[in-house]
């Protein structure tokens, strides 16, 4: 499997994979499949070209099989932080190490930016596999956001996690 930065040329594959993710795990994302399906392809292209976001894709052959994003902070006082977001691996490639490789690639990418000190993320409470993966990659829980996401009549909490990017 190959992991690389996605660009505007990957917009169709990125859109298809994220719509699959929103459909399969609606509680894991703050966007809904209906909201994102309504967005034109140009919106997805702009997302991939946004200088404040970096999206990494994991490819199985020519097929995009996993994704993870980094959102850089534009505000001066928070530019030392980056947020890991949009993590998803297709069911066919789950439990094969792609998730860990994507997280490690995101950490490596973040370390290329000297001003960054901290990487943070949220994971839906009850998503034990993702929580354990993040722990194995050095993240620690620092908070719990109750009722963070509503899907239909159900509410889901979000676990907040972080880790330092460099040794002190």
Language model features: what each stretch is:
Residues 90-92, 96, 125-126:
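Active-site acidic-Proline motif in GNAT/NAT acetyltransferases
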């Amino acid at each position: 499997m190959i992991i690389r930065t996605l660009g505007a040329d990957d917009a169709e594959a990125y859109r298809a994979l994220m719509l699959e993710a929103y459909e399969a795990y609606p509680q894991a994302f703050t966007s809904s499949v209906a909201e994102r399906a309504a967005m034109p392809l140009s919106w997805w292209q702009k997302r991939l070209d946004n200088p404040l976001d970096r999206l990494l894709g994991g490819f199985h052959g020519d097929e995009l099989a996993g994704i993870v994003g980094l959102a850089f902070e534009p505000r001066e006082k928070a530019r030392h932080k980056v947020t890991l977001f949009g993590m998803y691996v297709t069911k066919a490639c789950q439990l094969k190490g792609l998730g860990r490789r994507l997280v490690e690639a995101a950490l490596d990418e973040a370390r290329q930016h000297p001003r960054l000190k901290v990487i943070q993320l949220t994971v839906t409470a009850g998503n034990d596999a993702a929580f354990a993966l993040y722990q194995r990659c050095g993240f620690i829980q620092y908070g719990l956001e109750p009722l963070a996401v509503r899907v239909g009549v159900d509410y889901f909490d979000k676990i907040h996690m972080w880790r330092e990017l460099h040794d002190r």
